[in-house]
């Protein structure tokens, strides 16, 4: 479920590539889930919650639809300095157009990067056995061009900013992004370090 049609389309294409047939995709708002209470064995969220204006309301809705004893796990981005692939693209855009300083309390990529923040929201929603851990990994791409293509497909905040640019500005940003990405070449691939936080909690019996 997602509010963004392009994200659902990307998920659908990936499911097709993987040959998955037991999955469905639908547009919806996590702060008002169209499902009965106590109806899900598990809920997962992948890089979604930090973009919501009402995160506590979303957590309460997730807790509502979970069956007693069932779990939710949500992945969000960790600190920006640990995720250069994201900062790289935003820096390139800022070199082309003026952007206002980000509001740390507003919805955004790193809104839930602070350790324990999402865990606290889950606890307030009534979940128990709540955990919050940071995981380190890598993103690997065949080329800087592949990284750029992937970025334009899945990074909604970048997509929204790029949509406001002229064709010449878009080309300028693309060149800046691919040049900066080339600094992360390892052998014949582009490899970025990444860090995510995963918070999980269980609905009480």
Language model segments and positions:
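Class I SAM-dependent methyltransferase SAM/SAH-binding core
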Residues: 1-36, 42, 56-60
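Short, hinge-like loop/turn segments at secondary-structure boundaries
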Residues: 16-19, 41-42, 90-92, 148-151
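Conserved Class I S-adenosyl-L-methionine
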Residues: 13, 30, 106-205
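Conserved catalytic/acceptor-binding region of the Class I
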Residues: 56-57, 67-142
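Short SAM/SAH-binding signature in class I
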Residues: 39-47, 73, 196-199
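A short SAM/SAH-binding and catalytic strip from SAM-dependent methyltransferases
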Residues: 41-56, 78-80
């Amino acid at each position: 479920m997602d509010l963004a049609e392009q994200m659902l389309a990307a998920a659908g294409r990936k499911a097709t590539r993987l040959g998955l047939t037991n999955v469905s995709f639908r547009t919806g708002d996590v702060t008002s889930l169209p499902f009965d209470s106590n109806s899900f064995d598990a809920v997962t969220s992948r890089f979604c919650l930090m973009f919501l204006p009402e995160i506590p309301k979303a957590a309460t809705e997730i807790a509502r639809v979970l069956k007693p004893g069932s779990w939710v796990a949500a992945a969000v981005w960790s600190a920006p300095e640990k995720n250069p692939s994201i900062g790289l693209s935003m820096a390139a855009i800022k070199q082309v157009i003026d952007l206002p300083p980000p509001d740390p309390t507003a919805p955004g990529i790193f809104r839930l990067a602070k350790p324990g923040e999402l865990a606290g929201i889950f606890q307030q929603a009534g979940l128990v056995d709540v955990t919050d851990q940071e995981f380190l990994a890598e993103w690997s791409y065949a080329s800087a061009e592949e990284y750029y293509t992937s970025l334009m497909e899945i990074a909604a905040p970048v997509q929204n900013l790029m949509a406001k640019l002229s064709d010449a500005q878009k080309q300028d940003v693309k060149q800046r992004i691919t040049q900066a990405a080339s600094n992360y070449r390892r052998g014949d691939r582009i490899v970025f370090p990444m860090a995510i936080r995963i918070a999980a909690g269980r609905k009480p019996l």
